[in-house]
A protein has these predicted regions:
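Acidic/polar, low-complexity intrinsically disordered N-terminal segments immediately downstream
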Residues: 1-70, 74-78, 301, 305-320, ...
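Structural motif
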Residues: 5-12, 57-70, 113-115, 151-159, ...
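A short beta-strand motif characteristic of beta-propeller blades
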Residues: 20-32, 78-88, 121-128, 164-174, ...
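Repeated scaffold domains used in trafficking and secretory/extracellular systems
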Residues: 32-41, 89-98, 131-141, 175-187, ...
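Acidic, serine/threonine- and glycine-rich low-complexity intrinsically disordered segments
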Residues: 119-246, 250, 254-258
Length: 344
């Protein structure tokens, strides 16, 4: 993200062999990302990078950078297109992005979700997405998904066919009430993982948007959700989440003979990062899982005031929960999260 009043955003790239390229975007382009970088989307050989403030920070100070939305080549990181804050003046603090093609780029802001046609720079509000949550989209099967926050919640489906979203309700009767959705992610079989909370109970849910079938597994903690809206990360049926600096894993068993409470016994406490390293004072903006290796990536900072003392952790939890597979220190400035090219 960078410091929201004084710094531009940046992109740190870690190679397959574990080499770190600090501020890779600037290294390639000679210029910088916009202020408070928030989210990235991969589509058709391009990466779409959205920033909250672009070339003007929250207090109105102009900054020298490439703007609010930047489109780069996914292999070279070379800038192909840039949109300034004035180009996207309709948007109010954008935070998340998804892309289906050049004419269907979806951006979430404080009002809801807009569709951007990057060819014409036209922004169109998607009806039915009012107050869309500050959370990452799910993109699959040619559609984009977010969720409806609050007690009347469900999955919101956005199709490129029109600018009207469709709400898909969760089943009315469930073992663990869904009063609050903490986050969603795509499951490998086309279902959607849903982390939820209701009446004092947290659950991991696997939801099919076509049949509306849901499988629930209760967990013992209410996971921490960072400002980027990431509540958990998944690899196959392994779900990783955190409460403070303590990391947990749920091996999600879909056996229909099991009830939701079976998840309580299936949950594993893996490690407490603050017990390993005194500089791991805070988990910052969620977890990520490498789609090929299954290694879990975690960002920590010492404190908000001491954010330059930070660590990127990589764990192979099948091998060790105490000794990280890799550890990269002092590369981030308020990290927005981990982003991997889609597919295995």
């Amino acid at each position: 993200e960078g410091n929201m009043t004084t710094e531009n955003g940046s992109l740190t790239y870690i190679t397959e062999d574990g080499y770190v390229f600090d501020d890779a975007y600037k290294t390639v382009n000679g210029t910088e990302l916009g202020n408070v970088a928030q989210d990235m989307a991969f589509c058709d050989g391009k990466i779409y990078i959205i920033t909250q403030n672009g070339d003007e920070n929250a207090v109105g100070t102009k900054l020298e950078n490439d703007g609010m939305l930047i489109v780069v080549n996914a292999k070279t990181l070379k800038k192909e297109m840039a949109f300034s804050r004035s180009d996207l003046s309709t948007l109010d603090w954008p935070t998340h992005i998804a892309a289906l093609d050049a004419e269907h780029v979806y951006i979430r802001d404080n009002k809801g979700v807009y569709r951007l046609n990057t060819n014409t720079k036209e922004l169109t509000f998607v009806s039915g997405t009012d107050n869309a949550p500050k959370s990452r989209f799910v993109t699959m099967n040619g559609k984009v998904y977010t969720y409806k926050a609050g007690t009347l919640n469900g999955i919101i489906e956005i199709s490129p066919e029109n600018d009207n979203a469709t709400k898909i309700n969760f089943p009315y009767r469930v073992e663990i009430s869904i009063n609050e959705v903490l986050g969603i992610q795509a499951a490998e079989n086309g279902d959607i993982w849903v982390m939820s909370f209701g009446f004092g109970k947290s659950a991991m849910n696997k939801f099919n948007v076509e049949s509306k079938k849901i499988i629930q597994r209760q967990i013992n903690v209410k996971p921490s959700v960072g400002s980027s809206g990431v509540a958990f990360a998944s690899y196959d049926n392994n779900i990783y989440y955190a409460d403070g600096t303590t990391i947990y894993r749920l091996k999600f068993d879909e056996d229909e003979s099991l009830n939701a409470a079976s998840g309580l016994d299936a949950e594993e406490t893996l490690t407490d990062l603050s017990a390993i390293d005194n500089n791991a004072g805070l988990l910052y903006n969620g977890l990520g899982v490498h789609p090929v290796t299954g290694n879990v990536y975690i960002n920590t900072i010492k404190s908000f005031a001491q954010y330059t003392q930070n660590t990127i952790w990589s764990f192979d939890f099948n091998n060790s929960a105490e000794n990280p597979a890799a550890k990269y220190e002092n590369y981030t400035n308020f990290p927005a999260g981990f982003f991997f090219a889609p597919g295995k």
